[in-house]
Amino acid sequence: RRVLFRSADTVEVYEAPIDAMSGASLKIIQHTGNWRGVHYLALGGTDYAALDAFLTYYPNITHIVLCLDNDEAGRTRTQDIIKHLDGSGKTVEDRQPPIGKDYNDTLVQVTQEYQKHCISLDDILEEETR
């Protein structure tokens, strides 16, 4: 059995599990990187105790990508975490959602946009019967 994530040196941090799954899905859909090449962590809100515990358990992490929500609480907590990790020797990146409040909103919007440009199987079958 292979352990996929042990050697990853990057963690992407989200507020909610659905956002972490959406972030991974966006990597797959948009071909923006190896979705298995990073750890995904959901804080269950904006408290960063889970991040501290994760970093203790995975000391090899050198790159932290903060993907918190695009609202006041998410933006404030992002700045708090950046200050908290200052001097840790880790690279901290703020990657707020490009569309909507969170990464699930982004995934929904991207998926809807892709669907506008796709031909459905029903359309193909209907075209063949004409």
Where are these regions (language model features)?
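Helix N-cap/beta->alpha junction signal
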Residues: 15-18
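Conserved beta-strand elements of the Class I
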Residues: 11-13
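Short, high-confidence coil segments that cap the C-terminus of an alpha-helix
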Residues: 7-8, 61
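Short coil/turn connectors at secondary-structure junctions
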Residues: 8-9, 36
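Short, small-residue-biased leader/transition segments that mark boundaries at the very start
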Residues: 3-4
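TOPRIM fold recognition
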Residues: 25-130
